[in-house]
Amino acid sequence: MHKRTFSIAAGGMVLAAALGMAGISTAHAQSKQIVYLTPGLDLPFWRYLSKGVESVAKEKGYGFQALDSRNSAQTQLQNAQDAIAKGVAGIVLSPTDSSTAPAVLALAAEKKIPVVIADIGTNSGDYVSFIISDNFEGAKGVGEALAAALKEKGWAKDSVGLITISQARKNGQARTNGFRDGLKAGGATGSEAGLQQMQTYTADETFKYTQDMLTANPGMRGLFVQTDQPAIGALRAIKAARRQGQVPVAAFDGIPDFVDLLKSGEIVASGMQQPYLMGQRSAQAMFMHLEGGKPEKQITVPILVVTSKNIDKVLPTVKTTVFANEVK
């Protein structure tokens, strides 16, 4: 009787242990996932960065998911809550803007989920590492290239317009300030035709902003658009106004369409961040932390200032680190 009772009890203990181990295994399996919270996958830049994170996560045997915030801080917060509820191993965060990032960081910190920030930056909060491009120097190089193009045409004293990303973002502020310094350093001394901040980050939005700027400033001779896809809208507006060749356009980041546009001179320069490389660096910092290491608090990835004059030389690098091997 006692022997049987002991056997049953022992069997129960073995079963409980087995169930416990299964529970641990399941929880561990659930946690072997990296989530990337992105502002909006409609912009190629974020898609390329996402691919970089995914490539390293898969190398490490982890699952990966990108959650699109559709440029909404509220949606990004909800995405963060969903990821945290699933008990993910770590979050790579590109905030919708720097002022809303602390709310996401606070949620993750409460559940002890590590966060690596990729690109935009935060006003406050705890994080493992911040992977950033040197937006100021990149934009300064773009400003210098546009100034050179204006000087060649004899337009160095004419006005230049800016269509920017959100100036609530630290990277947006750096691009604006760097570009202004670059224009000045390059000898462009004209006034600023105006500054419009993007809201939807679409080519259609930039088309309208450019139309309005050209109408209000008929003497405008240059334009800086602070991200890639929207720059196509600016070119369309210049063409619609029959001002082709009269308003040189400089841009930031890069999409495959830029290759031919740079070669033709329709875009004179673009400060190309390397989003695929940034995504890889973000994931590498995360795994260093998960494996007990201590990554650098800030990791800077250089920006490639690509111009009509150097595009052929730098194109092999651009295809990999900028376009995530989507271009052959």
Model-derived segments and spans:
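A residue-level marker of the well-folded mature domains of exported/periplasmic proteins
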Residues: 27-328
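A detector of low-complexity, intrinsically disordered, Ser/Thr/Gly/Pro/Ala-rich segments
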Residues: 3, 22-24, 36
